[in-house]
């Protein structure tokens, strides 16, 4: 069994007498107590709860993270991620997962609001190979890449057995139609509870409320969000605790699964060159993005001694 050696308590959740009582009990068990001024909902959404002598405490060690440009990238692999999804799905309803790459990390580094959104997610997964590579160089040997398209495939593959229901939000009606066909062919028994292609413009408050009601009425377990970064992360954060499912932003995964875009060969994925393959597919849209963010990331890692 796992031994708790250190508990961290949100400052505003306990009064002084309760803190002293918890500290005294914890010390009897050889456990260190820290008090930090953070929001309790942030802690509860990212951590696993435990008890010491019947008292509620918080253990922040459930998910190890590596700070990359101010973004807390989870140290994980696909197996660990899938295990967490299965064990925490009910607790994480209404929350969201970000799938981070160099572009989103550099954007978050320069945009405090977007950085908060990334760090407020239950997980910011290392979709980009350079992120997991950086984590390993920082001593996190277990850090592996977990891409949005691969995660969606893995979840869909076990969904019939688990009874999980899926909603797809984003992309075009044509892509969603292809996506439904491919998912039903490849993953027999998977329940697609619904799909929605939102307008490119910003929805009115009334339209947005109606969309949320339609999503929740289908009772999904997962809402896959394919709006592209940073739009999809902003959408998920704005709908936290409104959409009653776990939201996962997966970018181009809809297009990959539908067959609109081919993924890079495995050798390119393994050598962190998937960005180059995508650049060759769509140079007009991606050239300036990759030039800007990749150079900034390389400069940052160089200054960090990596």
Residue ranges and their predicted role:
Residues 3-6, 215-229:
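Proline-aspartate-enriched helix->loop->beta-strand connector
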Residues 63-150:
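N-terminal nucleotide/polyanion-binding subdomain common to many enzyme families
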Residues 136-218:
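Conserved beta-alpha
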Residues 63-71, 130-137, 263-306:
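A transmembrane-helix-recognition feature enriched in membrane-embedded lipid enzymes
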Residues 12-14, 39, 102-105, 227-232, ...:
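Short glycine-rich anion-binding loops that position phosphate/pyrophosphate groups of nucleotides
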Residues 1-71, 239-248, 252-258, 262-266, ...:
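N-terminal hydrophobic signal-anchor/signal peptide
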Residues 5, 122, 193, 221, ...:
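Conserved acidic residues
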Residues 16-19, 82, 176-177, 231-236:
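Short, well-ordered alpha-helical microsegments
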């Amino acid at each position: 069994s796992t031994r708790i050696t250190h508990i961290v308590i949100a400052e505003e959740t306990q009064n002084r007498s309760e803190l002293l009582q918890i500290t005294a009990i914890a010390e009897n068990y050889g456990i260190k107590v820290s008090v930090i001024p953070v929001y309790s909902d942030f802690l509860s959404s990212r951590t696993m709860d435990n008890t010491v002598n019947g008292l509620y405490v918080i253990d922040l060690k459930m998910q190890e993270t590596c700070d990359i440009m101010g973004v807390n990238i989870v140290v994980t692999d696909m197996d660990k991620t899938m295990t967490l999804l299965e064990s925490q799905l009910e607790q994480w309803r209404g929350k969201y997962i970000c799938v981070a790459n160099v572009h989103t990390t550099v954007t978050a580094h320069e945009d405090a609001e977007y950085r908060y959104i990334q760090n407020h997610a239950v997980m910011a997964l290392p979709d980009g190979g350079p992120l997991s590579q950086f984590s390993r160089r920082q001593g996190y040997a277990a850090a592996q890449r977990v891409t949005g398209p691969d995660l969606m495939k893995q979840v869909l593959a076990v969904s019939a057995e688990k009874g999980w229901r899926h909603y797809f939000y984003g992309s075009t009606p044509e892509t969603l139609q292809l996506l439904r066909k491919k998912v039903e062919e490849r993953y027999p028994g998977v329940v697609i509870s619904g799909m929605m292609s939102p307008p490119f413009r910003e929805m009115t408050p009334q339209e947005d409320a109606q969309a949320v009601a339609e999503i929740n009425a289908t009772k999904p377990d997962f809402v896959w969000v394919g709006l592209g970064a940073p739009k999809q992360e902003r959408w998920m954060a704005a709908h936290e605790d409104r959409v009653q499912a776990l939201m996962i932003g997966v970018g181009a995964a809809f297009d990959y699964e539908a067959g609109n875009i081919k993924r890079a060969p495995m050798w390119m994925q393994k050598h962190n060159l998937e960005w180059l393959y995508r650049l060759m597919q769509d140079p007009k849209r991606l050239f300036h993005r990759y030039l800007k963010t990749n150079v900034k990331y390389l400069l940052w890692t160089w200054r960090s001694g990596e």
